[in-house]
Amino acid sequence: MLTADIPPNQSIYIQNLNERIKKEELKRSLYCLFSQFGRILDVVALKTPKLRGQAWVTFSEVTAAGHAVRQMQNFPFYDKPMRLQYAKAKSDCLAKAEGTFVPKDKKRKQEEKVERKREDSQRPNTANGPSANGPSANNGVPAPSFQPSGQETMPPNNILFIQNLPHETTSMMLQLLFEQYPGFKEIRMIDAKPGIAFVEYEDDVQASIAMQPLQGFKITPQNPMVISFAKK
């Protein structure tokens, strides 16, 4: 239900999110879920005590935000129904673009500083590990590129083969995308082979319907999905 005293704008405020989900996974999942409504400019989620279970998503268009609020109200996201409304304050990215940005107050800055320190303390130390830009950045395996494989010409199948996924993709992130289409059954991922997944539907017609709009969908800007029918 839209909040009457908050005028429609490009940012939406989301509550009742699962607090056990890690921040980066939460942001990626929200991006995947809400990209269907329009271009997303920013996703903000902090894990400080006061801001847990909340997030903000900013679209490039007000109409996209409106569609998202109406259609995703009470949507079960990580086993909890989301509560959505328009955000009260303009997002930083919009304010900067319009030249009206005012820095956050000291208290908010301090909260973000504490959050960054907490994340840094939990991040594994890679100082002596392989260079992030070196050939071993992905355990010696080159990052997948957007190259269609021969499997794109496979005959229709009720199982889709997904390639070029970011290695941090989770089954829940994919489920949020593919369960929007009728006949969805399950996601299958292989731990030993990151970057690929299988999505099963009840029949090959339903699989084809899902394939068309999601072909090339970008979970991250660098990773357009490559979808083909799986081998029978």
Curated annotation (Swiss-Prot):
Q: Name a single GO cellular component.
A: spliceosomal complex
Tell me which InterPro entries the record gives.
Answer: Nucleotide-bd_a/b_plait_sf (IPR012677), RBD_domain_sf (IPR035979), RRM_dom (IPR000504)
Ribonucleoprotein among keywords: yes
Q: Where is this region: Disordered?
A: 100-157
Q: Which GO terms describe its molecular function?
A: RNA binding
Q: Which UniProt keywords apply?
A: Cytoplasm, mRNA processing, mRNA splicing, Nucleus, Repeat, Ribonucleoprotein, RNA-binding, Spliceosome
At the top level, the lineage of the source is: Eukaryota
Which spans does this entry mark as compositional bias, Polar residues?
A: 123-139, 146-156
Keyword Nucleus part of the UniProt annotation: yes
| Subcellular localization | Nucleus, Cajal body; Nucleus, Nucleoplasm; Cytoplasm
Q: Pfam families annotated for this entry?
A: RRM_1
Set out the biological process GO terms recorded for this chain's protein.
cis assembly of pre-catalytic spliceosome
Basic and acidic residues: bias regions: 108-122
- Write out the transmembrane intervals: none
Pinpoint the RRM domain residues: 10-89, 158-232
Task: Kindly give the SMART domains that the UniProt entry links to this protein.
Answer: RRM
Q: Which PANTHER family match?
A: U1 SMALL NUCLEAR RIBONUCLEOPROTEIN A/U2 SMALL NUCLEAR RIBONUCLEOPROTEIN B
> Quaternary structure per UniProt?
Component of the spliceosome where it is associated with snRNP U2.
Q: What does this protein do?
A: Involved in nuclear pre-mRNA splicing.
- So what family is this one in? Belongs to the RRM U1 A/B'' family.
Q: What is this protein called?
A: U2 small nuclear ribonucleoprotein B''
